[in-house]
Amino acid sequence: GNVGNSLALQVAEDPHAVYVIELSSFQLDNMYDFKADIAILLNITPDHLDRYNYEMQNYVDAKFRILQNQTVEDAFIFWNDDPIIAREIAKRHPEATLYPFAETHEAGVKGYTEDKKIRIETSNGTFTMEQDLLALSGTHNLYNSLASGIASKLVDIHDENLRASLSDFTGVEHRLEKVARVRGVDYINDSKATNVNSCWYALQSMTTPLVLILGGTDKGNDYSEIEELVKKKVHALIFLGVDNTKLHAFFDGKVPVIEDARSM
């Protein structure tokens, strides 16, 4: 996926009992014998539609290949409130044992928040932790913590190790990565946010006025998803795309300042 390290190289050089792999839809398209002991789908939103003939279902089918070959002995962890995932589960009836997570407690949910704590319930026991001790902020990182917490309990990670990891994890490069502060302005690199939904979560986590750089290659994006957050939080937009026509068509007149740029 986006991590960039070869799984085959990791296995060849330094074998471990457990491997955590990020798999892109591009990789899943060509995987047939692979089976995940624990598969995780955080959400599904439009992305890479230029690769999938601008048909959302084709992209969804690719993402759900992560469940191929799973049995009841395997686990499928997913966000319970994602409408596309819910629809596909009802249609596909996965063989894997289901471990949904949600922000609030619902019937059957294995990870949720309650009384300002995260709570994870599996056959290996119950784990709780104060929500304000999580190292990473934002709703998306709460979901990430719940999903990774369920997976950790399923492989029997000790509670003290899980708690330590969730409280001191520093994040990864290019994902809301704080690069520098210059004259009171924070510069944040979120270049891994390659779709509109990722941008929504980034904007949702911000608490100060923003200058937002948008660009790249349009992949069938629907910018209405971030329209209200842009109006509310963004002071200036800088377009850094191959073709900014669609960006201008949607955002012109909606923020005080809009500029085009050719490079960082």
Protein language model annotation of sequence segments:
Residues 33-43, 203, 207-212:
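Inter-motif core of Ras-like GTPase G domains
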Residues 18-20, 75, 209-211:
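Residue-level preference for the first positions of well-ordered beta-strands
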Residues 22, 43, 79, 213-214:
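Short beta-strand segments
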Residues 1-6:
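Short beta-strand-centered segment that lines the nucleotide-binding/catalytic pocket of NTP-utilizing
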Residues 153-158, 164, 168-172, 178-186, ...:
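ATP-dependent carboxylate-amine ligase
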Residues 18-26, 186-192:
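Switch II (G3) loop of P-loop NTPases
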Residues 8-16, 37-187, 248, 256-260:
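Acidic, Mg2+-coordinating active-site environments of NTP-dependent enzymes
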Residues 33, 71-72, 93-94, 207, ...:
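Short conserved AdoMet
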